[in-house]
Amino acid sequence: MRVCVLSDSHYFTGRLNTILMKTAAEGPIDALIHLGDGYDDLRALDTPLPPVYQVAGNCDLFRSDTRNIIELSGARLLLTHGHFQHVKNGTDELLETALEENCRAALYRHTHVQKMERRQGVLLLNPGAAASGRYAVLHIGPDGAVEAELRSL
């Protein structure tokens, strides 16, 4: 399964469209994950979208869905913008939540800095800010194994 992961589009829908077109040109996108700060941006696109999973960020006013756990191809994924897990101070709290929820990956944002690390068997992935042309592609194997690539336009 191939998943495009992005966040912090901040109304730069042109960049979102470019990211999606570039990713789709490399192969089918099975799902799209948006991690907040641009919650409604995907609705502004004129292109057909794969299934979308998203959470709200600190700039998405009047939204309370700031955390979600989904299962794709047998892998449990924690989705969060990260501001309530204090990711600007590190990923320990995020990792703890992912472990408690038996997640193979925790996808987060808020810092606008791309980062990928694996700790205690959990992939911690920050795709970077889509408004700056940064995103990630997640690969989920048939056994639920999760790998990722950080990308930039």
Model-identified regions with their sequence ranges:
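Short amphipathic alpha-helical segments
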Residues: 17-18, 44-47, 66-67, 91-92, ...
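Active-site neighborhood of phospho(di)ester-bond hydrolases with catalytic His/Asp-centered motifs
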Residues: 5-7, 31-37, 53-58, 78-81, ...
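N-terminal active-site segment of His-dependent metallophosphoesterases
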Residues: 1-49
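Mid-chain, well-packed structural core segment of small domains
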Residues: 73-108, 113
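Binuclear metal-dependent phosphoesterase catalytic core
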Residues: 18, 22, 71-73, 99-102, ...
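Active-site environment of divalent metal-dependent phosphoester hydrolases
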Residues: 10-14, 39-43, 59-64, 85-89, ...
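Helix-adjacent hinge/juxtasegments
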Residues: 47-87
